[in-house]
Each structure stands twice: as C-alpha cells, then as structure tokens.
Amino acid sequence: MDKLNWTLTKTNLSLLISLASFADDWDPLLSGNSFEGWEQHGGVAKYEIKNGEVTGTSVANTPNSFMTTARAYTDFVLEFEVWVQDGLNSGVQFRSNTKPDPDLSDGRVFGYQFELDTAERAWTAGIYDEANRGWLYPVSYNEPARYLFKNEQWNTARIECVGNEVQTFLNGKQVSHLVDEKTISGFIGLQVHSIRGSEHEGYKVRWRNLRINTQSPKLSPPEGIYIRNIKPNSLSSPEKAQGWTLLFNGRKANEWKSAKGIDAFSKKDWEVKDEALMIHAGSKVGDLVSKKAYGAFEFDFEFRLTEGANSGVKYFVSDFAAPGQAANYLGLEYQIIDDNLHPDAKQGVVGNRTGASLYDLIPRYQEVQTRKVPLHIGSWNHGRIVAFPNGTVQHWLNGFNVVEYERGSNIYDALVARSKYEKYENFGLEAKGLLLLQNHNDEVSYRSLKIREL
C-alpha cells in the first residue's frame, strides 16, 4: 500500500471511529414496546406503544396527561419525531417535576415544555412553563419559525439543555433560545392536553425515534435569533456577541443621570434595591435619562408596578426647553401604568393611555392571536421597544407585539397633530434621542435594562 493510500485509510478509519463514538453517546428513551422506566401523571389520556412509536389519545374531561420518565435529566440533547392531529394541543416536558395538588393524587406536573401547537397561533417549539410562569419564549419572538411545523405530518424536533441555556429546533431550524436558572433538572414527559367536551376526543399525537445524549451535550452555534434572558441584569455570551450591552448591572446606574441635573439617588427618590432601580412613592426629584443617545435600537427591560402606579419609558427623547429655561425632556412613551386603578389610563382616546400603549397616540392591542395580553401588578413584566432603521417601531409586552407604527408616516403625523404634542415641532422624529425612565411619584421598579443598536 502506498503512503498516500495509507494516509487516506487512516483518516477514514479515524472518522469512522469518531462517528461511532458520537453515535454511542446517544441512548433511546424507550425500550422496545414497553413503558418500563416511565410513569403517567395527571389525567387519564391513553398512551400506547407499538414498534417503538408512542401514541397518545385524548380523553374528554380529564386534566392534562403526561407520560414521563422516572429518571431526571440535567444537561442533555433530546431528539424526536412528532406527528399531531390537527386541532389537538400537546407538548414535550423537559427538566420538569411534580408538586402537590389537592385535585391530583400523584401531584401536578410543572416545568419547561416544548410546545406542540396545531392552532392558527402556530407556536410549536416555543417554550412554555407548564403550571408555573406561563410563556417564556413564545414563537412571536421568532416569527418565521411559526411556519415550520406541519400538522398531520412527521416533524423532527431537538431540545438542547446545557447549564442555564435552552435551545429548541424544529425541522432543522432554530426556534427559541432561552437563558433561565429556574429549574436545572427534571424528567422528560409526553403531554396529551386536556380537552373540553367531545369535539376533539380520540385525537392523536404520535412520537417516535426518541433519543437522548447526556454524555456529550453541546449547544448548537446560535443562528442569530432573539435571546430571551430571564436571569436578572445579566448578559449571556451569545447576547454579547449580538451586540447587547447592559444599562444597569443591578448595583450601579452609571449609564443614567437625573433629568434635573441633580443626584437623584442621594435624595433617596430613586434607589437601587434588591438589584432593581426603584422609584419611591412621593418622590420629587424627577426622571432619569440615559447618558447616551440612540438611533435604531432594541431596548429590553423589566418593570414592576405597585397598585395604582404610573410611570413610563420614553425614547427618541429631546430637550424642548427654551434657551435659559430648565430642561424639558420629551419623547415617545411606552406607557407603564395600572390600567385598572390609575385614572390616567381611562383618559385619552380609545385606550391610548393604557399600559404598553404609545402614550396619547396609539392604544396597545388588548388581545393578540386570540390571547389576552397580561399586564401584571406586583410582579415583573417584560417590556421591549424595537426601533428599526426604516422608521418602524414596535412595543412588546410579555411576549406580545402590542403596538406597531412608522415614525414620520402620514398616520403618525396626523396622530401627533391631534395629541398633547402637537405644539412641538418634529416631535419624536429626531435621528437619535435619549432614553428616559419616568418618575411619576409612584413606586415602580426597573431591572434588566439592556440595549443593542441596529
């Protein structure tokens, strides 16, 4: 054998050994036609296994049903194929557990879920926190991925869990990227969703080729989609690579200054408390403005309202004060308010002063894709403002795009002309502007303030 052929043979042999080693890292989740090592929780939907394929069949008037592994998993890559009958909702639990429930003798399943959604909403492969926090990564964050799932066809799926990062994939494309530390270990489960009445009774969901890699789990290289980081005041390595920077690190507010030119923190009107920027009720110092101006940008933040409170996040902010007068910072406002208890939410026109609205200009959608958009009082909400280079601006609230408009359009100009801002020339039309956190003398807290320029 000549030297070249010997070298090629060694290379091929090494490749085969490497592939065989990689294949050995995978284990089947099912053993033949047996549910040995699995247990059912919740409702009484029917599960059967034949030729390595699991079929779940819906049963009317029973809670969500789960066929789960007895074993818990921490870091892993899970792959499977799934087929869902049109009209049925389902999911795959991971890093999940049970908690006591008076209505369920074996406890209530809770934890992360890879959604299987045949409805028009089409959020398959989004991440839902079953019986806990609700939607963590709705597929509205990655709109093109809504069209990947095929009802009543076999689809390939992949879940990657390594440390505090979770990525999901559907038919070879990345759907979600979550950073969260709530649960780091738990079982894997196959869900058949509860149904009301008999219309969808007997509907089926099928799984096959379930396999798991716990020996060498790795995250796939990010595909540049939006990353939802729930860990407060932090940036993951992929976020940094996308150009995100923190505007508050949980300890110091060095990226902000008082709009009145005084130290808002020495007056105790603003305070860093429990890793959040908190406005004290009854404070008089005023707003905080960013030290830097921004053009096209994506701004992420979390906010927490107390009952009856009012605040706001303003952007493309400019100083409209006359020469020699005190600063008069004005800009477009993402309204933050208790819709039920603060009187200003009832003012304006058709709800354009409610939470997440473009204040005094455009009301937020109260429902998106048949779902009521939540606005929490006393717990954290996720806000997001995206100002694209083409002038389009979006307001997001807890995973829903609730306002969208174009700065400088005819509609925008007409709305401004009929608002409290009509006397300010070129209102909201500057190429760049400051960000502003509004102090309305009510207790409101902010955290996880981060931005990237587009």
How should these model regions be labeled?
Residues S18-S21:
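N-terminal signal peptide c-region/cleavage motif recognized by signal peptidases
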Residues D24-L454:
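Carbohydrate-interacting regions of secretory-pathway proteins
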Residues D2-N12:
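Bacterial N-terminal signal peptides that target proteins for export
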